[in-house]
Design a protein with these regions (language model features):
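Glycine-rich phosphate-binding active-site loops on the catalytic face of alpha/beta enzymes
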Residues: 36-49, 85-107
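Alpha-helix-loop-beta-strand connector modules within alpha/beta enzyme cores
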Residues: 1-16, 50-75, 106-126
């Protein structure tokens, strides 16, 4: 409670430590009572796609009293699963393995990534 109060006027996000609680609905109820703004969760699995069923339950239980932000292993192959959950926010690095340690190979690559993120943002806002 004290951390949440100290964080004001900033929003407070409770991170994936939540994924270790034994009774997730009870834990979510506590976060709502504490007035946390957001919960980052993988649905108590290694990746959010594996925990999507619990994430759906958390979204339904929250009834917009707290933002549920799926995170862990979300990428271009599974992001639509989460966009279709009607969440406001998704956490992800959207990284890919590279053959070399170099940064990006060209400005075009940066612009393509930026366009992808802009398109995803537009879909999330719909």
């Amino acid at each position: 409670r004290e951390l949440i109060e100290l964080s004001k006027p900033l929003e407070f996000t409770f991170h994936r430590a939540f994924d270790e609680v034994l009774k997730p609905i009870d834990g979510l109820r506590q976060l709502i009572e504490l007035k946390a703004n957001r919960l980052l969760t993988s649905g108590q699995k290694n990746t959010a796609i594996k925990g999507i069923n619990l994430i759906k339950k958390l979204i339904n239980f929250s009834n917009n009293r707290i933002k549920i932000m799926p995170g862990s292993g979300i990428n271009s192959t599974n992001i639509l699963e989460f966009i279709n959950l009607d969440v406001d926010e998704i956490h992800g690095s959207f990284s890919k393995d590279r053959k070399s340690k170099q940064s990006v190979s060209s400005i075009d690559e940066i612009l393509r990534c930026n366009n992808l993120m802009t398109d995803l943002h537009k879909k999330l806002k719909k």
